[in-house]
A protein has these predicted regions:
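Bacterial Sec-dependent N-terminal signal peptides
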Residues: 1-53, 374
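Sec-dependent signal peptide cleavage junction
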Residues: 45-115
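Exposed, low-structure sequence patches enriched in small/polar residues
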Residues: 48, 147, 172-174, 291-334, ...
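Outer-membrane beta-barrel proteins
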Residues: 77, 90-94, 101, 182, ...
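Short strand-turn segments of transmembrane beta-barrel domains in outer membranes
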Residues: 150-152, 163-169, 173-195, 216-217
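Flexible loop and strand-edge segments within Gram-negative outer membrane beta-barrel domains
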Residues: 239-300, 328-338, 347, 355, ...
Length: 513
């Protein structure tokens, strides 16, 4: 009797667990997702020896596959010897937007430990806010980017975003995947996934996703973001035609609470054990949210016009173009106004700020390499940018076209590497300029000394020029001055002992919001 009851209970439990069958369409959908994730495991990117004969001229490094094989870049000499019998970690390459190449690093070091966070970067010289992934306050103003177009100007939240230079292109002899996972404060997780494979020795794709959600220690402080990125690069068999494509979409949501109220500040400073639980502390409001949506697309193609069998003696000329579109949508919404920010503007019942920014760039460039001048690239760039406050009719939108010219020169003088770049605006009221120069000299015992200078002039951002908040006290229209930075830097590096750097920076008209 007991066995019959146990059998009956097991059957009943089994019927409850499988009382509803999974629909066929849902099974097929799950199967498609499973096959998509497993696809890189079955892809083999093996380099076959090129055919020989009179129809294919012999070239130097014929059996090597390099992301810049026709670029002849003396300062970027990493290459892949893609033979099945000899594959090492140095054959897995990461190519930056500037076509600098490094190999994938799988070592476990202290530097990797400090990068084990939601930003996947070392937070040295940054002060993080209380919640994981919320924002980082910079303690140093050393970081800069080679950009002359004006940005939207919300610098306080910039650390949450995936910036263009943080994602590059790949070349791998076998499929490569990278997984990051970490729990966050109170409740939530942070993850970063990258899958890349060479479908063909000259065709690569990479797809990555970064997700983050953290509840935080205080009330109404949830931080979350979802960032998807994709890149692909192709080079035809003779190395003349090259294509690069990059797509990046991101969505960031951050609850805002205005900080602790006066009573909670006193409770916090008292050190009472009761308030070690930060959720007991009251905040100024619990009804505001910041939302950011960003989309970025980059398409780049070039073609080698002049070439020869001997790439070390004959100049090579390459022509190309690059198109980029960057769209940002910033929104701040609040269910009820907070008296600490003042009164609302006329005819408004609750705060809602919406700023839209778009930047479109088109570059036409040429790359010349020769034993005499080294590597030189020149370009002319067309900027088309707009800034609009979607819900406000007080200030008109800003739309402007601007042009700039620039170039980059790389040359090796014996053991000394020299690199210089510049871009100068030739039209447009808000376009900036920059000049950069750097030398690198190997020293004794694998030590390397790097020194240089940089100068930059850039618009601080459209939000400093005009902004119409729902709060009447946060509305302005100005004519901001250009932000100017001058820096001199030096760095002593060693592959085992690390880096020691010194930078002195002088900044005029610095703006922060």
């Amino acid at each position: 009797m007991l066995n019959a009851k146990l059998t009956k209970n097991r059957l009943k439990t089994k019927q409850q667990l499988f009382s509803k069958s999974i629909p066929l369409l849902k099974q097929l959908s799950v199967l498609r997702i499973f096959l998509f994730l497993c696809f890189p495991l079955f892809v083999l990117a093996q380099a076959k020896p090129p055919p020989t004969g009179p129809q294919l001229p012999k070239r130097i490094n014929e059996k090597k596959i390099t992301p810049n094989s026709s670029n002849a870049n003396a300062l970027d000499s990493l290459s892949v010897n893609a033979t099945d019998a000899d594959i090492s970690i140095t054959d897995y390459l990461i190519i930056s937007q500037a076509r600098d190449t490094i190999h994938v690093d799988t070592t476990l070091t202290m530097a990797k430990y400090y990068k084990f966070n939601s930003q996947r970067s070392d937070n040295f010289a940054y002060l993080p806010l209380n919640n994981s992934g919320q924002a980082l306050n910079p303690l140093s103003l050393e970081t800069w980017y080679k950009e002359t177009a004006p940005a939207v100007g919300f610098k306080a939240k910039e650390s949450q975003r995936f910036l263009p230079h943080q994602f590059g292109y790949y070349h791998v002899p076998t499929p490569l995947s990278e997984l990051f996972f970490k729990t966050t404060q109170s409740q939530g997780q942070s993850t970063d996934v990258l899958i890349t494979a060479n479908i063909h020795p000259r065709l690569n794709y990479a797809i990555g996703y970064r997700g983050h959600r953290s509840l935080g220690k205080y009330q109404h402080q949830i931080s979350g973001r979802s960032q998807l990125r994709f890149s692909t690069r192709y080079e035809n068999p003779n190395g003349r035609y090259r294509l690069r494509l990059q797509i990046m979409n991101q969505k960031i949501s951050q609850q805002e609470n205005g900080g602790l109220n006066e009573a909670s500040i006193q409770d916090f400073e008292s050190g009472d054990d009761e308030f070690f639980d930060r959720e007991r502390l009251e905040v100024n409001f619990e009804n505001a949210t910041n939302n950011f949506i960003g989309k970025r697309y980059v398409l780049e193609q070039d073609y080698l016009l002049l070439r020869s069998n001997d790439s070390l003696q004959t100049p090579r000329l390459r022509l190309g173009y690059r198109m980029q579109s960057d769209i940002q949508d910033n929104r701040f919404s609040q269910d009820q106004a907070y008296s600490g920010y003042g009164d609302l503007a006329a005819n408004l019942t609750k705060p809602y700020d919406h700023v839209y920014y778009s930047l479109r760039q088109f570059d036409a460039y040429t790359i010349l390499t020769s034993p005499t001048i080294g590597w030189f690239s020149g370009h002319i760039r067309h900027h088309k940018y707009s800034y609009k406050e979607a819900e406000q009719l007080v200030n008109p939108s800003i739309n402007e076209d601007a042009y700039a010219v620039g170039g980059e020169w790389r040359k090796r003088f014996g053991s000394l590497d020299f690199r210089a770049s510049a871009e100068i605006g030739i039209s447009g009221d808000r376009i900036g300029n920059y000049v950069f120069g750097e030398i690198k000299q190997p020293l004794f015992s694998s030590f390397t000394l790097t020194a240089g200078l940089r100068w930059q002039q850039q618009h601080p951002g459209f939000v400093f020029e005009q902004f119409t908040s729902s709060y009447a006290d946060y509305q302005w229209k100005n004519t901001p001055e250009m932000e100017q930075r001058t820096a001199i830097f030096a760095q002593l590096s060693h592959p085992h002992f690390g880096k020691l750097s010194l930078t002195t920076t002088h900044i005029n008209n610095y703006a922060y919001y």
